Every structure is written in structure tokens, then in C-alpha cells.
Amino acid sequence: RSGTSAPKALQGWISPQGLMEQLEKDIATANSVLQNTPFDLLRDPDGLNLRKYQINAIEAAERAIIDGKQTVLLSMATGTGKTRTILGMIYRFIKSDRFKRVLFLVDRTALGEQAEDVFKEVKIEELMTLDSIYNIKGLDEKEIDKETKIHIATVQSLVKRILYPESATMPSVTDYDLIVVDE
């Protein structure tokens, strides 16, 4: 626990495995790695090829997280590349070990399918996609696998898993350490 950690109420009990994961986190080192990692991969014309405003958005989100903020809002107009921007941001957060497991939450199945397609098609590093670098679970997969780095789900499916759990499909409070909500 760092001196800047603010207390917060948890919505459930942390499992022993979740507690171990929390104790193994080295947020200071991850923040340092994140700050010192250049944005060259995100600018690469053979990769994401993000524009200046997209990289500025990622930098602002990273600064907020490093400064201890719990929530960040990125607002971008339709057609400005929100999904590609988020892809770059998620990649940097996972690569730096700042976050271990990401929930990408959408309000419609079509948005989830679109995001999943982008994650599986857009090249990031050494002509590899996010899906080929990290394990991604799509909309149709409900079980939370500890090796999964990114899980795409609709709000409705998540509410169903929380309110009407079937076997082990109910997420624990430590299953995701970053939640990205698209629209």
C-alpha cells in the first residue's frame, strides 16, 4: 500500500488468489515503465498509425492513472478512431504490467463485434495483432480465465452474470483491474 492510496469500499470479498495478485503488483515500477515507454509503436505506419490527437488522449489517460485517478473519461467524436485509440492504450497498460486484466464493456453486441474485429486485425508490434500477443475472450465467452488479458462483454451480459450467476461465471471484485466502457 502506498502513502497515496485512498481507501475505498469493495463490492464483495477478495478471493485468496485475488489477494495474492494484489500483493504481487508493483504499481510504482509499472508506472515508471509506462512513463518511459516511447509511443513509436503507436505512430508506426505499418501498425496502429495513430494521429497526434489520439496519442495525446492516451498520454492524458496514462498521466491520470499514474497520478492516482480511479476514473478517466475520453470523449471523441464519431469516426475519430476511438477503438484504435483504446486498443493502443490497453496495449500500453498491459505491456507495462500496469493492469493485468481488462474488461472492455460495450452497450451493444455490434460494438463488441466491431471492437473484437479491430483487436484481431490491426497490427501493433512486429506485425502481430493484440489478439495474437495477448489472450482475448469475445462476447460469446462467459467464463473468466486467469490467462485472459482482455475480455469483451456487453453491459447486459455482465449484469446477468452478476445478478443471476451460473456456476463460476460471476466475476470477482479482483477479476478485472481495468474496465473500459465504449459508448
Predicted regions and their residues:
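Walker B catalytic acidic pair
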Residues: D182-E183
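ATP-dependent helicase/translocase motor core
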Residues: R1-R101, V106, A110, Q114-E126, ...
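Conserved helicase motor
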Residues: T109, L130-E141, V155-K160
